[in-house]
Amino acid sequence: MSSSDLVAASIQGNLDEQISQLMQCKPLSEPDVRALCEKAKEILAEESNVQPVKSPVTICGDIHGQFHDLAELFRIGGQCPDTNYLFMGDYVDRGYYSVETVTLLVALKVRYPQRLTILRGNHESRQITQVYGFYDECLRKYGNANVWKTFTDLFDYFPLTALVESEIFCLHGGLSPSIETLDNVRSFDRVQEVPHEGAMCDLLWSDPDDCCGWGMSPRGAGYTFGQDISEQFHQTNNLKLIARAHQLVMEGYNWSHEQKVVTIFSAPNYCYRCGNMASILEVDDCRGHTFIQFDPAPRRGEPDVTRRTPDYFL
């Protein structure tokens, strides 16, 4: 075995130890997080704004720091790397274990880069995480904001969208009046904080709606888009389905626009109080799809969190 092979094996072994530690909901040290994120940055920088993904793959929605429910998701859907996963953003904020959740997903990405795709959600941003919990959690668990800064710098590199077998377009939020084609998405520079407006913002913030055309979003960012918009986007880009997350749906998944758009939400009993089911979408070798719904994992003793995070649209 060459010296480079030995180094690679050592790094891999160390990663496996870190993943094992994280699976027990134990955070990594600050230096380990920094080294992990540097490696992840190299991998993610090579990925496209529209990252191609092969089937079979299991598509997942928001996790929001609900670590034990993520562990349940892996128990039901299969462990990585036995199952390929595509996560559509919002790993942090609201739940009590954002640090462990996002660190585990990034560690799995570094260990199995071809098996896991992690997209950016609207909560993978500096501004949002300072309000909805991740920043405060990092301060509480590490005593400073260094880990928060390390992760929010890494978030700039997360791909914005993915394309499964050239026919299922996956993203966190929704469509944009600034984007007609997937090539439009491929062409812009994503390595930045999520802007307040424009195409990149819309991809992470928009929602499907029953009304036709484009509408003002009640969220204050992105747009609402009607079935006519979805149909045109499907036709222009030869798509079969748009899969997205971003909205709480009580059954864990919800069809809209005559099954041209599906919302997938993977945080059961969201915020530990909403009473919803979660789901994941399995896309098989033949591109058939199956939804798997699941309930919350048993509650553990939750940490004392004195500061209540403000509500916004769920």
Curated annotation (Swiss-Prot):
Q: Which GO terms describe its molecular function?
A: metal ion binding; protein serine/threonine phosphatase activity
- EC category name: hydrolase
Biological process per Gene Ontology, one example term: mitotic cell cycle
Catalysed reaction(s)? O-phospho-L-seryl-[protein] + H2O = L-seryl-[protein] + phosphate; O-phospho-L-threonyl-[protein] + H2O = L-threonyl-[protein] + phosphate
Cofactor binding summary note: Binds 2 manganese ions per subunit.
CDD domains, per the entry: MPP_PP2A_PP4_PP6 (cd07415)
Q: Where is the active site?
A: H123
Residues that, per the record, bind Mn(2+) 1: D62, H64, D90
What keywords is this UniProt entry annotated with? Cytoplasm, Hydrolase, Manganese, Metal-binding, Protein phosphatase
Q: Which family does it belong to?
A: Belongs to the PPP phosphatase family. PP-2A subfamily.
PANTHER family recorded:
SERINE/THREONINE-PROTEIN PHOSPHATASE PP2A-RELATED
- The protein's name is Serine/threonine-protein phosphatase PP2A-5 catalytic subunit
**Gene name, Swiss-Prot/TrEMBL:** NPP5
